[in-house]
Amino acid sequence: MTELKLLQCRLDGRYDIEDCLGRGSYAEIYMARDRGAADERFRKVVIKALNVLLQGYQDADLERTLIQNFQNEAIALDRVRHPNIISRLGHGTAIDLTGTAFHYIVLEYLGGGDLSMLCRKEALKLDRALFFLQQICAGLAHAHESGVIHRDIKPQNLLLTTNHEIVKIADFGVAKIEAAEGAITRVGTNIYAAPEHNPLVQTAALDPNSRQSAQTQLTPAADIYSLAKTAYTMICGVPPRAFAHHAITELPAPMSLEPWAPSVLRVLERATQARPGERYQRMQDFWDELSDAALPATRPLIATPAPRHISSDLKLEADLVTAAAPPMNVFAKLSSKLSTSCSRVIRIPNSNGR
């Protein structure tokens, strides 16, 4: 494993990298301070750095796919700006202290963790789960209207503000963009992914055509499937492992004993059918059915009805991070030539000047 040397460094002359928040298979996530931010709300940011060497080997084809993955995420985030979708604040290429070239994206910092962390403590009350689900549906509806299918909706990709009042969709790295060429083919997270875009799952029952045909014809129903599996986790407090690659057909106790359980289960079961055509086709339809199914249980808990419409016009009464970003430029390919065209990080001196 070869990690980037970025801690206590300044990236692009403005981002002071303070901490590593985590590492995935091919990316490193850092918290940084933006010295160029005029607004204090934008001062703390997240740097997502692509590192093709994290697995300890190099593969030219994989490298091209990962770079395209990164490019795809930046393009998608520019296209789908919305209060419930993470904001891209910048992007670029740089070289770390060891001379390793890498691509990076600058994202807004939320600070409230993700829904998987929240649900790990205990299942959410139904009205609280619906509060978050309405926001997620609004963000996904806007993405779909903009020609973007996320493909990897799961609790870990749903981030929360510090006060846990706003949820935002993150990680558009495997999103399918309408009319885009060279679609990313990385598998979505299996337990939440719709069968039509997961080549590890036998999907012959989906359609007489090939699995590849199913992958190239992704529709919003794929995200609806994943969101329904996510809703199960939120409501039940456990991942839907018993229904991996299958429709949700029951809720565990004690949720199954709740008066709302049969009607909510019917919605989740329809949304997770193997055949895309048998699911809800629009995010608005899924939300309408789900909120109606839960209405008897939530009516005593909600003083005034929540707004039902979840279109891209949804407005939230909160200060939202929606900074404008420059037009997306295609990332340069990683090569030895990068050293002449991208910035180098510099070490930040400590208090004694070292």
Residue locations for each model-derived region?
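AlphaC helix of the eukaryotic protein kinase fold
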Residues: 54-79
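C-terminal lobe helix-coil module of Hanks-type protein kinase domains
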Residues: 192-299
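Protein kinase catalytic-loop region centered on the HRD/HxD motif
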Residues: 136-148
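Protein kinase glycine-rich loop
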Residues: 18-25, 29
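Conserved short submotifs of the Hanks-type protein kinase catalytic core
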Residues: 98-114, 118
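Short beta-strand micro-motifs within the conserved protein kinase catalytic domain, predominantly
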Residues: 87-103
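Activation segment signature within eukaryotic-like protein kinase domains
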Residues: 132-133
